[in-house]
Amino acid sequence: MKTLYSLRRFYPVETLFNGTLALAGRDQETTGFAWWAGNARLINLSGKLLGAHVAHAGLIVFWAGAMNLFEVAHFVPEKPMYEQGLILLPHLATLGWGVGPGGEVVDTFPYFVSGVLHLISSAVLGFGGIYHALIGPETLEESLPFFGYVWKDRSKMTTILGIHLILLGVGAFLLVLKALYFGGVYDTWAPGGGDVRKITNLTLSPSVIFGYLLESPFGGEGWIVSVDNLEDIIGGHVWLGSICIFGGIWHILTKPFAWARRAFVWSGEAYLSYSLGALSVFGFIACCFVWFNNTAYPSEFYGPTGPEASQAQAFTFLVRDQRLGANVGSAQGPTGLGKYLMRSPTGEIIFGGETMRFWDLRAPWLEPLRGPNGLDLSRLKKDIQPWQERRSAEYMTHAPLGSLNSVGGVATEINAVNYVSPRSWLATSHFVLGFFFFVGHLWHAGRARAAAAGFEKGIDRDFEPVLSMNPLN
């Protein structure tokens, strides 16, 4: 097969420590890559690379199914999900499966079904991966030309991109269908403390949906992370799904324009770097979403956000001291500001104390107590419901930092419980993964650009000191 560059330029120079270790058709001499370079050995073997990817998908789906069943087996319905270290069941609950009013789990069978379906799927994927890795054709170009490709074939690459975009669009519409027709999804804002409901009044106005993208990412605005109702979330998925599907059709039917042909590097490693860059952005956005957003990630399942736990503490002590006779509207704190309530610089009534920094929190247990100018004093005196008190006391002691007030407290704080919030885990893991994927993006982009520019990449190991040393054994 013709390649874009000489083999010397296309592959880095890497020398095996043990030159006798070889796999037929997959050794360093025939591929230019040592065994530990993994899928790089399969750059020009589309059939074997397909096997590697399908097997990888099988591993991912197997983990999802096994972890799902593990969480079901350990689940205690009497305790909130976020106290049990669960990271998969909260996602299923958010989709409206197995939960009732207030986020209470009423049926774990759907979770069991989900785990089993993933395990069965992983077996199918695993079989396909092993088949294509060991038995199927090494290259697909001859026997299955539709599935074959050459990395530098720009038209074929954009066709593959288009197929991927259509699949992503279909995925977005699956969520829309679930929310509209198949039982609905969990809405933390439903009256009385959250419930599963069908979304009937989708937001499809482009000014609203795309308005989020034009917001500042900082406090009070919060870019797309500030979305606080399911109508906008599901409507956004209608827009996203439509854009992905029409974009996919566009990329299948067209060839890259001249400016795109000039601007991009067209090689396997370049596509890898583009993908890693995109995944990095996804990771950082997911981190912000799960840390700050309590609509897409309801606090009933993931635990409170940091600001939510802090505001819950202020609310809990306001309720307590008001019952003991304190006048919460006028009591002064040690700094001369309001002890329980104060005014923000723009005039709204907000909670006083160190939680003032979180004045822009919106949470379903707190919003009913607001009026046109922030917190409503008469509602705070007469309208507080028992479920709001219970929920705020629970959130106060379950801050995502493992501290009482999520600001300066520590895990040993007297009223806190020793637990790790899934919100912390999901935010931190996605930040770390986003960072490493970004480093991988830079690494592979640099190598791809170097190869395209025609100079050597990788380390020349012909004169490496280790080669002149005695073998370890």
Curated annotation (Swiss-Prot):
[CaMn4O5] cluster binds at E367. Residues 1-14 form a propeptide. Its main location: plastid. One of its GO terms (molecular function) is electron transporter, transferring electrons within the cyclic electron transport pathway of photosynthesis activity. This is Photosystem II CP43 reaction center protein. GO terms for cellular component: chloroplast thylakoid membrane; photosystem II. One of the components of the core complex of photosystem II (PSII). It binds chlorophyll and helps catalyze the primary light-induced photochemical processes of PSII. PSII is a light-driven water:plastoquinone oxidoreductase, using light energy to abstract electrons from H(2)O, generating O(2) and a proton gradient subsequently used for ATP formation. Binds multiple chlorophylls and provides some of the ligands for the Ca-4Mn-5O cluster of the oxygen-evolving complex. It may also provide a ligand for a Cl- that is required for oxygen evolution. PSII binds additional chlorophylls, carotenoids and specific lipids. It is found in: Plastid, Chloroplast thylakoid membrane. Belongs to the PsbB/PsbC family. PsbC subfamily. One of its GO terms (biological process) is photosynthetic electron transport in photosystem II. It comes from Cycas taitungensis (Prince sago). The keyword DNA-binding does not apply. PSII is composed of 1 copy each of membrane proteins PsbA, PsbB, PsbC, PsbD, PsbE, PsbF, PsbH, PsbI, PsbJ, PsbK, PsbL, PsbM, PsbT, PsbX, PsbY, PsbZ, Psb30/Ycf12, at least 3 peripheral proteins of the oxygen-evolving complex and a large number of cofactors. It forms dimeric complexes.
